[in-house]
Amino acid sequence: MTRNHQTIKAVPVLKTNNRRLNLEFYCQTLGMKNLLEEGPGVSLGDQTKSERLVIEESPGARSRKVVGPKKLAQITIKVEEPKEIEALLGQARPVLQVYQGEKGYAFKAVSPEGDIFLVHAEDDSQTLRALEKIPVFETQAEFTGLTQFYIEKVILNVPNKSVAQTYYQPFGDTLPIEFKEEEGQDLLAENAATWDLSMIKFSLERFDVDQLAELLEGRDLFVPKSKKFLLATDDSQIDLWFEQA
């Protein structure tokens, strides 16, 4: 992808079964703010009111639980203020693992749908060290959620890593996506068939829809007459939405 198409923001869209249970997890465990509820969708973000993640409730009549590994392996969240992670841990919500980094603590948590999130504030999350003994974190009554964070990385489980890399090759290293090779019957399931990652919305620094469409020639694309966005679908049936930041 050219310099004109640098990603400013990535917003994952996740299909969920129970909106209430998932909202409790995203707001209480991860510290997100409920920005807007509209229809089956909920827009989540931080205190700057910038959308960072969307959940869409999809009843069992339309979607089902994933069999085997999910398409979404992990979402990594980068927090601006390290001390706010301690505030989240002080709320005594269940987490999978707590880590120590140079700037402070980090943790990994699992949503009611089985989606894994790593929350940290480090320059490099690879430097995090898993803690065997978890310290006691004080409750911070004044804490009302994360001031600012962004989606740093989305890790996808794919049946063939080289095939996935070939599809995404035109984007270069401008998209915050990594791949992990796995085996699973639902890794190529239809987009709305399972409670899984259904879309990633990308806001681009400069959005030239004709140039982007040419770059992605031969792929499944949709561009409206207004040319305000471009919608592509990757080999895992995950929708990729591109628009001007």
Where are these regions (language model features)?
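N-terminal beta-strand motif that seeds the catalytic metal site of vicinal oxygen chelate
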Residues: 1-20, 75, 126-165, 197-200
